[in-house]
Amino acid sequence: MLTDPAEEAFLPNFLLLGAGTALVLCLVFFLYQKLDQSQFAVIKLGIWGSAVGLLMDTISLWNLPLIFPALSKGQVIAFTIWMVCAYCMYLLIPLILSHKK
């Protein structure tokens, strides 16, 4: 799935990966909303989840040769692009779900 952004297959793969990420995040937030019905529960999860995830991704990118030794530079760029978009969704989806209430 991690295709070099310079390749022609990058955009379709990226859109498919992004759609899958959005679906999984919607499901996670929907289930969490059923478990914790307090006000702003999903927003708190989005903020804390993003903070923890960004820290973990920072460490993984910092130690790239140890954690992802087989990735090319293009794949690392593709991973970083997906990661930024995923965290954007991780912050926006809870706002959308909270607004619908």
UniProtKB/Swiss-Prot annotation:
This is Uncharacterized protein YnzE. It comes from the Bacteria. The chain crosses the membrane at residues 10-32, 45-67, 77-99. GO terms for cellular component: plasma membrane. The lineage of its organism: Bacteria, Bacillati, Bacillota, Bacilli, Bacillales. InterPro entries: Uncharacterised_YnzE. It is found in: Cell membrane. It is a multi-pass membrane protein. The gene is ynzE. Keywords: Cell membrane, Membrane, Transmembrane, Transmembrane helix.
